[in-house]
């Protein structure tokens, strides 16, 4: 999957499954390209999610919910994901 399509898919899935005020998805793969663990076709993403719904959960519960929503993408296209919830 191409990174821009992945970003759009991630954003749409989060917005479909969680009540959000704002979702920003950033490609941070360029920061990791020289790492020995870098795999072509696997991306490093940063998610910034403004959600009163997720803010009601503790950090672990909110992160688990995002991981459940993005299960297929994490298994197939995402090497690393940073999640910031506000």
Where are the predicted features?
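N-terminal, polar/charged subdomain of small-to-medium soluble alpha/beta proteins
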Residues: 1-86
